[in-house]
């Protein structure tokens, strides 16, 4: 069961949902003008096997807006802060559309925190 909550990630209020269990973790990142709810059909398929985290990236859903421009690198930094806030050392990132670009930026900046894309 996913638990929705707000966390602070590098000073940014993020709306996340976390299954909270599993040895491995998968982070699902939505696309432009979407929200974490686009993953609702996938979450039940994954949660028996892995910990699943979904997130409204900054400026989307009900997460905090940080300004007019949200670069992929800035969002990757916030994703690192999210992992830290949730106590997750490493994760596999799955991104749709813009979420894919955020995942690639995360890979470039924090390869040691990534299990896969």
State the predicted function of each range.
Residues 1-13:
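N-terminal cap/lid segment of alpha/beta-hydrolase-fold proteins
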Residues 9, 17, 53-95:
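Active-site loop/oxyanion-hole signature of alpha/beta-hydrolase fold enzymes
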Residues 89-117:
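Conserved hydrolase catalytic core segment
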Residues 11, 21-23, 48, 84-90, ...:
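Active-site acidic short loop of glycosyltransferases
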Residues 12-65:
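Conserved HGGG/HGGXW glycine-rich cap/lid loop of the alpha/beta-hydrolase fold
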Residues 43-47, 69-72, 110-111:
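Glycine-rich, phosphate-binding/catalytic loops in enzymes
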Residues 40, 80, 104-108:
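Short, hydrophobic alpha-helix immediately C-terminal to the catalytic nucleophile
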